[in-house]
From Swiss-Prot:
Transmembrane segments: none annotated. This is 3-isopropylmalate dehydrogenase. It is found in: Cytoplasm. Its main location: cytoplasm.
Amino acid sequence: MTYKITSLAGDGIGPEIMTSGLQVLEAVAKKYNHTFEIESHPFGGAGIDVAQDPIPSSTLKACQDADAILLGAIGGPKWDNAPKRPEDGLLALRKALGLFANIRPIQVPSSITHLSPLKKEIVENTDFVVVRELTGGLYFGEPKHWDESAAVDSLTYTRAEIERIIEKAFEIAATRNKKVTSVDKANVLASSKLWRKIAEEVASRHPDITLEHLYIDAAAMLMIQRPTTFDVIVTENLFGDILSDEASVITGSLGMLPSASHAENGPSLYEPIHGSAPDIANQNIANPMSMISSVSMMLRQSFSLFKEADAIDAAATRTMQAGFLTADLGGNTTTTDFTNEVLKQIEGGE
């Protein structure tokens, strides 16, 4: 079968780690006899440079026509004063594709537990997923206004928006440890009261999955105190933005973690959680793990190529266990050498 993928390398370290990700994809294609048609297009600052737009029309069309999209990283000081910033392109892409669910898996490999800011006995065996709603809440609610004397943001959610994101969380939990933690502020916010009610309704349709509710402040504390207690966390846009970034710090490096954004229909977007890191761009020292893991996540969630995704994950784990660690993990392995070892492990693995 042929899979059509749009590659958006972006800015900063994006092109370097995208090269790593695509090399891994090519290795999988060769080993398991798949065909991946890859189209590369400018996006973010690179889009501004060539078309004065962070998401040129040709890039958007390629994304809409793809089976899945890989994104490296966007942004940098070069475009801080541009009429349209690189980040505007990502918001536009999410809207155009109808991406409503951001999925961020949080795992701490045993080879790097010492890098976590948490004690080893707290962080060991951490394995949970944050499911964040992307289309509603304070970021998009109207009215939205500010001037020198006052400002207003609106936290708005519809039943349909809440129900589909909570259903997505239960769908994911069904493939894991069958527990969903719904995070809200139902003791204060009207939107959270509706959120909690709908969560209970969805849970009633999934009797084999446990639902618990936590207020956002309690969830933020528990994530640090006992991260292993979580399986799938689901929450609204602002809370999800904060919690997913808090969760990412548990691993000790942003260079480790992938994410996925899903629509109800159409292609999904896979990307590392970190930024473009312009300070280390073009030095061959960026950690490509988050991009490699994004490729694995794409194979698993968009194409149901589970064996192939497992092969990538196992190869990356063996690479780190063998001592191939980039600078952010306390080592001195280059981007190229890390990638080459992963490729070697894929080729020689089961």
